[in-house]
From Swiss-Prot:
One of its GO terms (biological process) is L-histidine biosynthetic process. Its cofactor is Mg(2+); Zn(2+). Belongs to the PRA-CH family. Its EC number is 3.5.4.19. The gene is hisI. Binds 1 Mg(2+) ion per subunit. One of its GO terms (cellular component) is cytoplasm. It is an enzyme of class 3 (hydrolase). This is Phosphoribosyl-AMP cyclohydrolase. GO terms for molecular function: magnesium ion binding; phosphoribosyl-AMP cyclohydrolase activity; zinc ion binding.
C-alpha cells in the first residue's frame, strides 16, 4: 500500500492545486498529514501555513473555497496534485484566479491578469 512520505521534508509535502477541468495550476502550497486527512474527509482543500504555523482551509476568509475532485501523488509519494473546482473565481490571495499570473518576458517579470477581488477589502484585519 502506498503511503505519502511526510518525513522527507520534515512533515510536509508540496501540493500543486490544479483546476480539474482546465488543468490550470492555481497555486502551490504545503500539506501535512493532518491537512491531507482533513482534505480527504471534507472534500475541501486544507493546507499547512509555514508562516503562521497552522492548518487552514482554502477560502476560509475569502469564501473562495475549493471542492476537491481528485488527488494524485507522484512516483516517490512525496508530492501531491489536488484537482479542484475553484469557487468564487480566485484562488490567489492577491485576488487573481491563479497565483501564477506573473510571466518572465523580455528580461522582466510582467503581470498578466487583473484581480477578481480587492484583497484589502476581503482580508480586512
Amino acid at each position: 500500500m502506498i503511503q505519502i512520505d511526510f518525513e522527507k521534508m520534515g512533515g510536509l509535502v508540496p501540493a500543486i492545486i490544479q483546476d480539474y477541468q482546465t488543468n490550470e495550476v492555481l497555486m502551490v502550497a504545503f500539506i501535512d498529514e493532518k491537512a491531507l486527512k482533513l482534505t480527504l474527509e471534507t472534500g475541501k482543500t486544507w493546507l499547512f501555513s509555514r508562516s503562521r504555523n497552522k492548518h487552514w482551509m482554502k477560502g476560509e476568509q475569502s469564501g473562495n473555497t475549493q471542492e476537491v475532485q481528485e488527488v494524485y501523488t507522484d512516483c516517490d509519494a512525496d508530492a501531491l496534485v489536488i484537482k479542484v473546482k475553484q469557487n468564487g473565481g480566485a484562488a490567489c490571495h492577491t485576488g487573481n484566479r491563479s497565483c501564477f499570473y506573473v510571466r518572465w518576458e523580455d528580461g522582466a517579470w510582467v503581470e498578466h491578469s487583473e484581480p477578481l477581488f480587492d484583497p484589502d477589502e476581503v482580508y480586512k484585519k
